[in-house]
Amino acid sequence: MVLQGAKQRLCSSKNLDTCVLTPKYQTAYACEGKKLTIECEQGELINLIRANYGRFSITICNDHGNVEWSVNCMFPKSLTVLNSRCAHKNSCSVLAATSMFGDPCPGTHKYLEAHYQCVSAAQTSTTTNRPSPPPWVLNNGPPIFGNGSGLIHPTNIGGGSGGASAPPRLPTLPGVVGINGNGGMFNVPPPATHATPPGSTATLPGGRLKGVATSTTTTKHPAGRRDGLPPPPQLHHHHNHHTDETTPTKPSGKVPAASNATAPSNTRILTGVGGGGTDDGTLLTTKSSPNRTPGTAASGPSVSSNGSAVRTINNINLNAAGMAGADDETKLFCGPTHARNLFWNMTRVGDVNVQPCPGGAAGIAKWRCVLMKRMPDSSFDEDDEEMAGTSTTTPMSTSGDCLHNSSSCEPPVTMAHKVNQRLRNFEPTWHPLTPDLTQCRSLWLNNLEMRVNQRDSSLISIANDMSEVTSSKTLYGGDMLVTTKIIQTVSEKMLHDKETFPDQRQREAMIMELLHCVVKTGSNLLDESQLSSWLDLNPEDQMRVATSLLTGLEYNAFLLADTIIRERSVVQKVKNILLSVRVLETKTIQSSVVFPDSDQWPISSDRIELPRAALIENSEGGLVRIVFAAFDRLESILKPSYDHFDLKSSRSYVRNTAILTNDSDASAGDLQQRLRILNSKVISASLGKGRHIQLSQPITLTLKHLKTENVTNPTCVFWNYIDHAWSANGCSLESTNRTHSVCSCNHLTNFAILMDVVDEHQHSLFTMFDGNMRIFIYISIAICVVFIVIALLTLKLFNGVFVKSARTSIYINIYICLLAIELLFLLGIEQTETSIFCGFITVFLHCAILSGTSWFCYEAFHSYSTLTSDELLLEVDQTPKVNCYYLLSYGLSLSVVAISLVINPSTYTQNDYCVLMEANAVFYATFVAPVLIFFMAAIGYTFLSWIIMCRKSRTGLKTKEHTRLATVRFDIRCSFVFFLLLSAVWCSAYFYLRGAKMDEDVTGIYGYNFICFNTLLGLYIFVFHCIQNEKIRREYRKYVRQHAWLPKCLRCSKTSISSGIVAGGGTGLGGTNAGTLCSVSTAKKSKLPLGTNDDAHDEQQQQQHMSATEDAIMGASSDCELNEAQQRRTLKSGLITGTLQPSQSLGGHVVLERGNTLRSTGHASPTSSAGSTHLIFAHKQQQQQPPLGEAYYHQPDYYSWKQTAGGMKAQREYYNNAGAATSSPQQAHEVFYWTQKPNSQHGKKKRGGVGAIPASPSGSLHSRATAASQVLFYPSYKKTKPGQQAHPHYAEALDPPQPPNTAAYYQQQQQLRQQRQQQQQQLSSDEEQAEQHAHLLHLQHQQQQQQQRRAGGQQQLPAPPPHMAQYQQEFMQRQYRNKHSNCDLGDAYYNQGSVGGADGGPVYEEILSNRNSDAQHYEVGDFDVDEVYNNSVGTGVFNNMRAAVAAGGSRYGGSLSGGSVSSRNQQQQQHSLAQPISARRCTADEDDDEDEDDEETTAAEQLHDGVCDEEEEDEESDMEDDSHGLPPQSAERMRRLMALQDEDFKRRFQRQQRKHGAPVDYGTLPPGSAQAVIGGAHPEHNGAVFGVSGGVGEGSMRGALRQQHAKSPSARLAVNELFGHGNTGPPLPPANQTPAQKRQQLQKLSPQSTTSSSSHTSHSNPHSHPPHHQQRHLSAMLDENNTVRCYLEPLAK
């Protein structure tokens, strides 16, 4: 090692501006065979003062304490040799060997010693003061201490008590640092109030020594120091201007005290006790820079500081250049103290103080100074803090550029600050609690050891002397080793000497006497008076000595047992040992042998029982030789090993040792450590044959607990002679109580009970939390638990929103496991180890964590299997797979925990906290390994899923697959983030628990990381698994409004039901452009055309679009009203324009989102409920009657607009006065969904027609037996008529005068309404409900035709059929299911009539199932529109479509039907030419049975049946052909679905007509059907659209566009073509009209024009376009859940 020379600057106190630079004196050593390296700073040269190769001290380079070497060994030419190598050089290196210097004293291990100075090159010619020679050269006087030590303190050289003997330099242990000398060592004398203690030497690791300084600066001793130690000096640094205030005072000696202080910058907790090994031979050389050592005043010893030393503590280099101030330096030295009759001087942290053994003993004693964590009752009191605050030390610059003429020198403070912070919580402590006197041996025992090794020595005499010495003399650590060695030697020699005694009795007597002496000696060693002797040994030596004592006693006992040849029992009882030697004849052994007897050993109630069979099988010659022993106080020696502690923390050892010394203050700490103590006396048993062999039958031990309070977890153990430690192998705990434990062992040796100590002052894991962290942990766990519960309730309450899928089941189980983990953790951290719930909590927490990780793995696997199988296109219940997940998850977890319990149940109870298993092999095998396997599998499957998604994204997929792929991609992303958060939470919790146990500095960081990550985990679950789902958001709002127990402010929330406003014309509410879509994506790219308009646009249509932007939804009830402006939603996409939208845009109906999916920005109907959406359609307006004002369907003024033009103004003004202005922005549009189930893969099933209703209650829509084209919703229709007001607070506006001819009908409706309120929810199934509604429409069709004829007044219509009264009676007796809206809309809401007929006509409400399933794709080839158009002349579109299907062979099962748009006159004219084809479809068996009673079977029905049969046969081929078609188009799908739906209802309506004897008129359709024709006197107007059916015939937009634009047959059918408005489009539900539009209608639809219009239409060309009429736009989309949505245009005012 290198020592860097330093110049010591001594400044005069009289002249602060002048400094005299004095080179610093240094000493370096190198053991024989090693190199001595000397190095000075740049610009400085080596100036040698003296040198010697030989030996002047017995301690330097003497690790083994050899005292026979000569200490007067000197090579005279040593200085000459060194000068030739090092003089006037900056650095040099010299080998300390006889080849270089010669051998002045053969047989003595020598060392090279050099005294030198580092002087600047300019001062090499100046004269320097030669310091005094080393003290061991000048002083040879008698000792000054009465303990026989011939040492004096080196500061007393040259004066005081005459000549003093030189202090021997003693070796130290490897890996430790000496305490004195230059370059970072202290040698501080005590205050003048007491005698100067022996000197302390400066040793380096492995006995290597540091240089000794002889500076003479003194500092003031501050008041308040309890230990009487001088504080480190203040260092004032000025750039090139150093002011050192010194006041020389006289210390206790006549020569100024020599001292030098250096504060280390970085240390760590030291734990090694004692030491061993050999010197590594390296010499530690310290580089030192110049420094100042100012004193403050008055008197006191001197402490100088070396501000930039490079030191090594425990083989760790410490850079002291950035050291902290004096407040830290006071904590870097252990104070002087007296221990074991020795005075231990102040010692630097990391150094080992070495000195000769006390008087009467030979050898050396050592004691180390280490840093330890402060205890709560830290000795760093206010006085220390005040002292630390008044003195600061700033590091010196190491460059040497700060000359005394300069102004200032700024010191670096960064490192000092860091060191200051690190050392603030530590304090210097002597370690271990007592000095290490392992090498100290008494002269008496040394004499006995020499005697026992002599050939003719008397063993009995030696044993007697040994027992006397051990009982009367003070022993040291080395004496314990010698004594046990003598015991074993005596027994070995007696084994050979006993043969010299021919007489058996004499032989037994001699051995018995020897045994008595040995037992007495052992008892003396165990006596309390010799406890300090045991503590002189390090823990390893203590275990070795104890093992040697036990084996020596046992060996001597069996020496006697082998000598006895007959049955006999010998008992040796002394103070601390009871020894029993029994020789038994096997024939006399009748039962088990018990030791000890109750009267033999009153000290303890322990007993050991040997079974008879084990004794007999270990007999020899018919005799069984047994040795029993019971020990007192041995339990305080044989301490358990602390291998489960981190040995880097010395506090663990200090606490454990404190139990041995009953030092409660030393054991009090701020961290609950798990301590294992020996909680019973030690009892021993051995058999002669094999002694420690395995037994066929186990022995039974009953051991009494020494401590009954605050102990737990008893463990039966035996002492392993080989490992010198306690082991539990072969022993088990049979039973235990508060005072005793019963053990069973299958071998013999020394037994005891180990138990855990529980700190009575600290009860749980929370005791180590500070106040803030404890609160934060409670808050974090509470937040996470609340959000997990919300997620679970969401999946349960709103399960109708989702298809029951494997992913949903997986997440439910993940949430359950996480909830269990959070709750168990919260309970576990509050439990103590003594709690009965501690083990149970750990077991269940283990199981919950394993289950949670396994579900994460299965979630990743499920995503992977979804991408690699057909599940990508199917999201249905997967019960078999989920059942496998359940079995593997919970079954595997429980199995692992059960195995862990079987292997080692104590794993769950032996840890410090009740939330963590003990870190052993079982823990790593059953906890860490499975968790890592599951996590790695989850990461692997996630990685594979990403690869597959990347591949699929580059291939051409159908729209449905792209949508599903986007959903899976989003799920995988969310799951991966979820996985990362959960891993962070668990890792932070684990490292926090482990770090808190070891008291690591980063423990707090882990704790707060756990708090943050756990809170984020709860928020993530709620946001990304609940809030991000649009359906769940909608269901939350519905749920809030449907429950009366919630606060009214929540149920009447003004937040929009959906996520935006559907507005036309590109404007939203309030005149803003919120509804405008700004995307440049074309409809072609989006694959979902939104709409188009005809080339001709009249002023009326434009006004309608402008007024539609001002509409708003209003949902009202008796207690709340949604009549305010809806919240705007920022649209992130734009208006989708393209070739299909040539002139006008539909406005802000749809938003384009990721994955090329569209989402609505409109509103859902306020009558929607969970799992369904209500769509309300009105009867078509009869435009030739006096125009009736259209009302908003959700407003209470519906009937106020149904008056004539003359009375409309007054009533509108009346309504306006009620508070709702006509100019307020209001709109009403409807939303409905539909989906379709994919092809069934479960074999060929008998399919019903489209819309067939399953037999299960409420329609089991997900049966796998359904057809490929099965529509997954079954509409329910509610026929309502105008009646009482729906809103009492608008009673005047809602009670219009009723026509006189409808009084009887209204009376019937009043009775019917009362029945509805009393008999709700009575229909057993959707099948019954659908049949009921079909019957109602048939009845209403008949009644409405009569009313229209009477209202027209131009012709007399025939009276209603005779069975009309019967229909009305049945109509009143029917029971209906009443659907309430979110705001409790009553029946009156459904009684709001439409504008048809004199009484307004019925309003039909369609309830569509909102199931999350995949829709069936339809291709263009399914509908040959050209053929349909060519065959549609003079026929209804339904008949033409039936013919087209029959001719073309539909692939998808179920017939097609477009909405008929021809007038009634056209249908009547063409009826005779058309082939009547029944509108029946392939129905279920129950539907066919109902039709068997029908007497009429038309040709159309036969044709239809043939088509169904053909479809049944070609099912599988159709499924194959489907994969080769063109990419799907949402418009085709929508057209097909609605056509099938309309046809299904039409079939039911016609069946009702046939059942009641009415003629089946395929041109006369129900008023709710798309083909329904309500003409009468107004034949040119079409009926209202029921559902929204698209037509492909003459009157359809599709046919018109075919004719006008001549599109190719392969062109796709767009949504805007199917649902757009225009001259040829099918009529949609009517839109409200502006006052200007209504006046125009009054002029156009006058009675005169009505006749001419009727006549003209009756004879018009079939190909001519019908006149303009008010229609409403309909836009469609496919949302992220693969559900088709349609939005009707808002009603214009």
UniProtKB/Swiss-Prot annotation:
CDD domains: Gal_Rha_Lectin_dCirl (cd22830). Proteolytically cleaved into 2 subunits, an extracellular subunit and a seven-transmembrane subunit. Glycans are attached at residues 147, 260, 306, 345, 405, 662, 710, 737. The chain crosses the membrane at residues 775-795, 809-829, 836-856, 883-903, 928-948, 976-996, 1004-1024. Coiled coil: none annotated. It comes from the Eukaryota. Residues 1485-1498, 1508-1521 have a biased composition (Acidic residues). SUPFAM superfamilies: Family A G protein-coupled receptor-like. Residues 30-119 form the SUEL-type lectin domain. Keywords: Cell membrane, Disulfide bond, G-protein coupled receptor, Glycoprotein, Lectin, Membrane, Phosphoprotein, Receptor, Transducer, Transmembrane, Transmembrane helix. Residues 716-761 are annotated as: GPS. Disulfide bonds join 716-743, 731-745. Belongs to the G-protein coupled receptor 2 family. LN-TM7 subfamily. This is Latrophilin Cirl.
